């Protein structure tokens, strides 16, 4: 029996091969198969955001002005979430709410669902782009894995959280001041800053910033002075084969500073990857918990003692009072459709009053 070894070659290219050749061609801006998802979705998400912040009011959904046309600036303009009465409707332009009327669609908050969904798929497309290019140039896919952190946060905050609540209304609107309002809402209604998942997220993000600063400074401190140039940027050939800084010197330095130091570059750089990505993922998991209205830490014994003893107060009990204030003041302002009216006696006051 004869076994023929060799690569099977087709006589003529089919449509897939033709598209593959064109999409993955070496050009100034790589397109790739991921580009079929990334570029249209990113274009529509950004275009929808610029359109909404420029022209579209939030009067019908939040009772607010939210566009440049109404007098907002870059910090106060936003693409606002749909009204609470629309629940979790996808708000398709041709759906039963807008019925093909573009103006009405914008008034109802259709641009928010448009931007949120296209934005989510654009982020996923960008991660797939990193996978695709890494595979093409034979790199490992850790860039794409790292980018899963921001995707997890976006999806949990903008999609999963409102899905767990009564509607898209409770998601963040796409704007700077709108995000700040959402943060205050999270604190007042969920005590988010005392949530351990938020603590891990803060530790991850700030820890990553510290690691970046330390790493950059250490590399700059231990550069080999073997170039002719006068400064860092002129002294080295970008194609040189040898390393540009001394890991041994850096190790000795930090061993003296802390008593411990990274002994190899692989562990060092993996740690720099692990800290922020894990922090972002933990924060995203915490937001999923909030979508289900899971409580954070409750130190009930301190609350009971503070209620019984006017002279006993902790930073925790002070924060609980602040949260009650946020809820009492924000609920009426933020959910005008509920017609909430709080009598004076239920508004929170300090223990001393």
From Swiss-Prot:
Protein location: Plastid, Chloroplast thylakoid membrane
Source superkingdom: Eukaryota
Cofactor note: The D1/D2 heterodimer binds P680, chlorophylls that are the primary electron donor of PSII, and subsequent electron acceptors. It shares a non-heme iron and each subunit binds pheophytin, quinone, additional chlorophylls, carotenoids and lipids. There is also a Cl(-1) ion associated with D1 and D2, which is required for oxygen evolution. The PSII complex binds additional chlorophylls, carotenoids and specific lipids.
A GO BP annotation: photosynthetic electron transport in photosystem II
Membrane topology: Multi-pass membrane protein
Residues annotated as binding chlorophyll a PD2: 198
Modification type Phosphothreonine: residues: 2
GO molecular function, one term: chlorophyll binding
Residue positions binding Fe cation: 215, 269
GO-annotated cellular components: chloroplast thylakoid membrane; photosystem II
TM region(s), chain numbering: 41-61, 125-141, 153-166, 208-228, 279-295
Ligand binding (chlorophyll a ChlzD2): 118
Keyword presence, Glycosyltransferase: no
Annotated binding of a plastoquinone, by residue: 215, 262
Entry EC no(s): 1.10.3.9
Keyword tags: Acetylation, Chlorophyll, Chloroplast, Chromophore, Electron transport, Iron, Magnesium, Membrane, Metal-binding, Oxidoreductase, Phosphoprotein, Photosynthesis, Photosystem II, Plastid, Thylakoid, Transmembrane, Transmembrane helix, Transport
Statement: the UniProt record of this protein carries the keyword Cell division: no
Annotated residues for binding of pheophytin a: 130, 143
Classification via Pfam families: Photo_RC (PF00124)
Reaction catalysed by this enzyme: 2 a plastoquinone + 4 hnu + 2 H2O = 2 a plastoquinol + O2
Further remark: 2 of the reaction center chlorophylls (ChlD1 and ChlD2) are entirely coordinated by water.
Role, per record: Photosystem II (PSII) is a light-driven water:plastoquinone oxidoreductase that uses light energy to abstract electrons from H(2)O, generating O(2) and a proton gradient subsequently used for ATP formation. It consists of a core antenna complex that captures photons, and an electron transfer chain that converts photonic excitation into a charge separation. The D1/D2 (PsbA/PsbD) reaction center heterodimer binds P680, the primary electron donor of PSII as well as several subsequent electron acceptors. D2 is needed for assembly of a stable PSII complex.
Subunit field text: PSII is composed of 1 copy each of membrane proteins PsbA, PsbB, PsbC, PsbD, PsbE, PsbF, PsbH, PsbI, PsbJ, PsbK, PsbL, PsbM, PsbT, PsbX, PsbY, PsbZ, Psb30/Ycf12, at least 3 peripheral proteins of the oxygen-evolving complex and a large number of cofactors. It forms dimeric complexes.
Family statement drawn from the similarity comment of this UniProt entry: Belongs to the reaction center PufL/M/PsbA/D family.
Protein name: Photosystem II D2 protein
Taxonomic lineage: Eukaryota, Viridiplantae, Streptophyta, Embryophyta, Tracheophyta
